[in-house]
Amino acid sequence: MSSSLWLQCLQRLQEELPATEFSMWVRPLQAELKDNTLTLFAPNRFVLDWVRDKYLNNINRLLNEFCGTDIPILRFEVGSRQVVVPSSQIIAPAAPAVTLAPRPLPATRILQDDAPSRSWEPAPSPVQPESKSGYRSNVNPKHNFNNFVEGKSNQLGLAACRQVSDNPGAAYNPLFLYGGTGLGKTHLLHAVGNAIADRKPNARVVYMHSERFVQDMVKALQNNAIEEFKRYYRSVDALLIDDIQFFANKERSQEEFFHTFNALLEGNQQIILTSDRYPREINGVEDRLKSRFGWGLTVAIEPPELETRVAILMKKAENHNIRLPDEVAFFIAKRLRSNVRELEGALNRVIANANFTGRAITIDFVREALRDLLALQEKLVTIDNIQKTVAEYYKIKMSDMLSKRRSRSVARPRQMAMALAKELTNHSLPEIGDAFGGRDHTTVLHACRKIVQLREESHDIKEDYSNLIRTLST
């Protein structure tokens, strides 16, 4: 009874909620109906609190609809039950931005020696605090969840990483984060590693760039120590690999990682990967690997929106014991939009100039300190440049941007260009409308809202937006 009732609720919730929300928060819940009490089990406290806060009314409404007067009491608990709703009975969302696959069945874990053989050991890394189990984790202690600035652009990724750190190997495995350079993916990897190590001091957590995995494998082959290499990587509790796209065209490395990936998953050992693009779009990587990358949860890390950029600047300034005026933070954030590293670099330059000259940090001072950087941004990002870039991206004529044509093949790129003009320039809505064939400002506003909606609903539109932002901001 519990499976059929909760299955009905799941099917309706999947229809009502955005695919990202359903996969992230609702799908992991398990249900048990006993003594007229429906207990929903969440994988951790974070998910439980979120579901109860955001979706309790939806669930109660559906129970009332399906059960009539015989409504069960609803309870929430952290944990799991043995029998779960088969994932095959849930309607698969069409091209979701976040995908969730069934977790692998647990297997008997083979314990290895705590440290690899002396004939081979991992390549050195700049940051190498030794874990208590003897593994060089390479996790940077400076990066944690407390100093990661949350915004709409990274909210899902941050939530997923928190869940994984609460319950490694069980929450979402593998977790795949993708997005452009300098958006915080590496920070999140280190934050997960630190959180796991804080909770379980003896946990064997390894962070690395994908190229280091390749270097370690080559070294192991040269020293005839491939078995030690395998033991090391297959006996960790969490493997965090950055920039997995660098495995492209490295067939032997892909072969070894394929088997390592399978071994870790079978042992319920956590895997987190990052890339600069969606798994299926990584060229030069075997299809069987790309398929496995999407088995767990795939989350996009977007370029930060204005409010998040301002918050990042204020947080970084606070770390330097600098009071950054609000108007200065907004001035910088409105003009530098591509990624977090660019913002940090600009702020560091402003702070250094202020320290050297002893001057107060004002808008005029910032304009002078960043004059070359701001001039370059203003030169790169104009409405005309946006129109040309979007037209080329969607393979339409520049004249179509200004025309009255309403076919989707033209209207959608035009809406995208308007939304980008609002995000990337300082022009007002009427000015943007004038640049698009004399359109009214309400048309521009509608276009911006439409693109926001489509980015939530369509993976393709979200990818187009991110790709165009990167192109125009580089």
From Swiss-Prot:
SUPFAM superfamilies: P-loop containing nucleoside triphosphate hydrolases (SSF52540), TrpR-like (SSF48295). Domain I is involved in oligomerization and binding regulators, domain II is flexibile and of varying length in different bacteria, domain III forms the AAA+ region, while domain IV binds dsDNA. NCBIfam families: DnaA. It comes from the Bacteria. Keywords: ATP-binding, Cytoplasm, DNA replication, DNA-binding, Lipid-binding, Nucleotide-binding. Residues 91-137 are annotated as: Domain II. It is found in: Cytoplasm. It comes from Photobacterium profundum (strain SS9). Plays an essential role in the initiation and regulation of chromosomal replication. ATP-DnaA binds to the origin of replication (oriC) to initiate formation of the DNA replication initiation complex once per cell cycle. Binds the DnaA box (a 9 base pair repeat at the origin) and separates the double-stranded (ds)DNA. Forms a right-handed helical filament on oriC DNA; dsDNA binds to the exterior of the filament while single-stranded (ss)DNA is stabiized in the filament's interior. Residues 355-474 are annotated as: Domain IV, binds dsDNA. InterPro entries: AAA+_ATPase, Chromosome_initiator_DnaA, Chromosome_initiator_DnaA-like, Chromosome_initiator_DnaA_CS, DnaA_C, DnaA_dom, DnaA_N_dom, DnaA_N_sf. The gene is dnaA. Oligomerizes as a right-handed, spiral filament on DNA at oriC. Belongs to the DnaA family. PANTHER family: CHROMOSOMAL REPLICATION INITIATOR PROTEIN DNAA. Residues 138-354 are annotated as: Domain III, AAA+ region. Residues 128-137 have a biased composition (Polar residues). ATP binds at residues 182, 184-186. It holds the Pfam family Hda_lid. This is Chromosomal replication initiator protein DnaA. GO terms for biological process: DNA replication initiation; regulation of DNA replication. Residues 1-90 are annotated as: Domain I, interacts with DnaA modulators.
